[in-house]
């Protein structure tokens, strides 16, 4: 580590991984909230809501890929593309309701803003954050291979979080694919869908705990099958 570098190589990778873990957790929280809103409160998503949820899933794929296979610029680029699609969808929904005088908006409001407004804010922050991380070259230059490459001290925790996150993304994709069939059929989805089944919070919490338990088991066996090669990074 040179005198001008504040962080060592391992510290740099640790900070980069923690940033991606935090981003993945935040996006999973948003997606979990959307599932709870759909099944717990019976609020079926509108067509633009489905676009935003799908884009949020794509946005979360970037951090997951960084954690699994190492820090790569193309992973951030994938998240930026997903955020641009989601931002366009949420901006379109905002303008639709703003253009109609007296329109109360679609769905519940949180802290004075509807969910599509919060989605737009999330996508804007994601684009700005990915742009800043793209300008941070050191994690790209260190040859990081991710949790599926070489061993590091927090690999087990990172592997568990990533697998748990990917399972959540898979569940959300399945929910989108299955729910649009009875809701939309083979045509366009209704702009203002009727209320759906209200299953309560118990089902949502059971799903979260079940996914966490399965992810922990998978992460344990993956960890056992991985080699014992210690992590090495390129010298600065």
Kindly label every feature range from the protein language model:
Residues 52:
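Cys/His-rich metal-chelating microdomains
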Residues 2-45, 56-57, 72-236:
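Secretory/periplasmic and organellar redox-cofactor proteins
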Residues 59-70:
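Canonical alpha-helical transmembrane segments
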């Amino acid at each position: 580590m040179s005198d001008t570098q504040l962080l060592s190589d391992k510290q740099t990778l640790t900070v980069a991984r923690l940033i991606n873990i935090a981003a993945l957790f935040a996006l999973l929280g948003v997606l979990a909230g959307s599932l709870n809103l759909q099944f717990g409160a019976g609020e079926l998503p509108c067509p633009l809501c489905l676009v935003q949820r799908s884009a949020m899933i794509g946005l979360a794929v970037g951090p997951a890929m960084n954690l699994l296979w190492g820090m790569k610029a193309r992973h951030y680029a994938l998240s930026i593309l997903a955020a641009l699609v989601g931002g366009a969808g949420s901006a379109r929904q905002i303008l639709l309701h703003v253009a109609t005088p007296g329109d109360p908006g679609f769905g519940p409001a949180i802290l004075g803003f509807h969910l599509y407004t919060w989605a737009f804010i999330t996508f804007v922050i994601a684009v700005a954050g990915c742009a800043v991380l793209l300008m941070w070259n050191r994690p790209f230059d260190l040859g990081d291979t991710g949790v599926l490459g070489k061993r590091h001290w927090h690999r087990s925790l990172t592997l568990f979080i990533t697998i748990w996150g990917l399972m959540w993304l898979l569940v959300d994709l399945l929910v989108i694919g299955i729910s649009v069939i009875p809701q939309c059929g083979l045509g366009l989805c209704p702009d203002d869908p009727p209320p759906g089944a209200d299953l309560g919070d118990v089902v949502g919490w059971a799903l979260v705990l079940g996914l966490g338990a399965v992810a922990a088991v998978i992460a344990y066996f993956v960890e056992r099958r991985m080699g014992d090669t210690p992590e090495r990074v390129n010298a600065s």
